[in-house]
């Protein structure tokens, strides 16, 4: 199902992370880039304080090198690469503010949203000149032209997805594992859509996340930080844009969406009633506080991601 170049992209990106991470972890520890754990988080997370973060830099390096190796043959890889790089830069600045400047919450929410919308609108404005404004709706089995609404709708979906991936990065191996599965499905869809460039970029995501899991699975030796989660979120949705498949990505990334919605519901319900729907949001923390082991929550969420991908596959076949 995967072509030779995509398999090579997976292997190359995987090996880069495996080779670089053993050097990066002690270097991040030397720079005192330790994770700051919030006091209101689950008690079991307090022991994670000081674990090196910003490991997403290695994920990004892996994707960057792999993409550049294939760029001459597949120049359209440059579009999602630049978009992912821009979102990764926001994440890096956010991590820098939290870890180095010791401001625990990082950039202000308003600052991040403005920057994210600026990147999204710029990216969409450029690519729509080449791709047009039509997107594929799987359930309808046809393309729909969004016309003037293309940039407003797609930019909101992009920013929402990027932040949803960021919110999912709260347990050891959760975001990296879910993104590995999503990336693999996107690679397969890209091949069937005859988009080898997007298959290779998706493969780079798969390989880098696979390599990162070696060090991020419970108990994690390193976290990706916002550097990694925002970059991966931007990468995933930019592939969706290039494939004209934003709806499909919202389905296969259903776990991201559920995590984000759990936070939105928690905040809105608390403001209205001063009560909470969940013990804690995002949703993965709710299950932790119900007594589930962290590793169990992660594996169950991986399984649900696979189910979402199978649902998407069934919809495509209808």
Swiss-Prot record:
Keywords tagged on the record: Cell cycle, Cell division, Cell membrane, Cell shape, Cell wall biogenesis/degradation, Magnesium, Membrane, Metal-binding, Peptidoglycan synthesis, Transferase, Transmembrane, Transmembrane helix
Gene Ontology terms for molecular function: metal ion binding; phospho-N-acetylmuramoyl-pentapeptide-transferase activity; UDP-N-acetylmuramoyl-L-alanyl-D-glutamyl-meso-2,6-diaminopimelyl-D-alanyl-D-alanine:undecaprenyl-phosphate transferase activity
UniProt pathway annotation: Cell wall biogenesis; peptidoglycan biosynthesis
Protein name: Phospho-N-acetylmuramoyl-pentapeptide-transferase
Subcellular location: Cell membrane
Free-text function comment from the UniProt entry: Catalyzes the initial step of the lipid cycle reactions in the biosynthesis of the cell wall peptidoglycan: transfers peptidoglycan precursor phospho-MurNAc-pentapeptide from UDP-MurNAc-pentapeptide onto the lipid carrier undecaprenyl phosphate, yielding undecaprenyl-pyrophosphoryl-MurNAc-pentapeptide, known as lipid I.
InterPro entries: Glycosyl_transferase_4, PNAcMuramoyl-5peptid_Trfase, PNAcMuramoyl-5peptid_Trfase_CS
Keyword Zinc listed: no
Known catalytic reactions: UDP-N-acetyl-alpha-D-muramoyl-L-alanyl-gamma-D-glutamyl-meso-2,6-diaminopimeloyl-D-alanyl-D-alanine + di-trans,octa-cis-undecaprenyl phosphate = di-trans,octa-cis-undecaprenyl diphospho-N-acetyl-alpha-D-muramoyl-L-alanyl-D-glutamyl-meso-2,6-diaminopimeloyl-D-alanyl-D-alanine + UMP
Membrane-traversing stretches: 7-27, 50-70, 77-97, 113-133, 148-168, 173-193, 198-218, 221-241, 247-267, 298-318
Origin: domain of life: Bacteria
UniProt family annotation: Belongs to the glycosyltransferase 4 family. MraY subfamily.
Class in the EC hierarchy, top level: transferase
Membrane topology field: Multi-pass membrane protein
């Amino acid at each position: 199902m995967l072509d030779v170049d995509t398999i090579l992209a997976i292997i190359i990106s995987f090996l880069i992370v495996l080779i670089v991470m053993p050097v990066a972890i002690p270097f991040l520890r030397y720079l005192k880039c330790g994770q700051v754990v919030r006091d209101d988080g689950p008690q079991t997370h307090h022991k994670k304080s000081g674990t090196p973060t910003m490991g997403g830099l290695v994920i990004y390096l892996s994707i960057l090198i792999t993409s550049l190796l294939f760029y001459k043959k597949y120049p359209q890889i440059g579009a999602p690469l630049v978009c992912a790089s821009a979102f990764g830069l926001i994440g890096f600045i956010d991590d820098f503010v939290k870890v180095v400047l010791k401001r625990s919450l990082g950039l202000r929410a308003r600052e991040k949203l403005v920057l994210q919308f600026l990147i999204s609108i710029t990216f969409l404005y450029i690519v729509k000149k080449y791709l047009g404004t039509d997107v594929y709706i799987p359930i309808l089995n046809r393309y729909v032209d969004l016309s003037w609404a293309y940039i407003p709708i797609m930019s909101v979906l992009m920013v929402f997805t990027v932040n949803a991936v960021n919110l999912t990065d709260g347990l050891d191996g959760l975001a990296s594992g879910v993104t590995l599965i999503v990336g693999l499905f996107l690679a397969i869809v890209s091949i069937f859509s005859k988009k080898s460039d997007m298959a290779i970029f998706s493969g780079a995501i798969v390989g880098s996340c696979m390599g990162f899991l070696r060090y991020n699975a419970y108990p994690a030796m390193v976290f990706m930080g916002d550097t990694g989660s925002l970059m991966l979120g931007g990468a995933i949705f930019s592939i969706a844009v290039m494939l004209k498949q934003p709806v499909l990505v919202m389905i296969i990334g259903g776990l991201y969406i559920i995590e984000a919605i759990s936070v939105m519901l928690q905040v809105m319900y608390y403001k209205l009633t001063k009560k909470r729907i969940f013990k804690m949001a995002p949703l993965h923390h709710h299950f932790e506080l119900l007594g589930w082991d962290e590793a169990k929550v992660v594996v169950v969420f991986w399984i649900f991601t696979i189910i979402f991908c199978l649902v998407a596959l069934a919809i495509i076949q209808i």
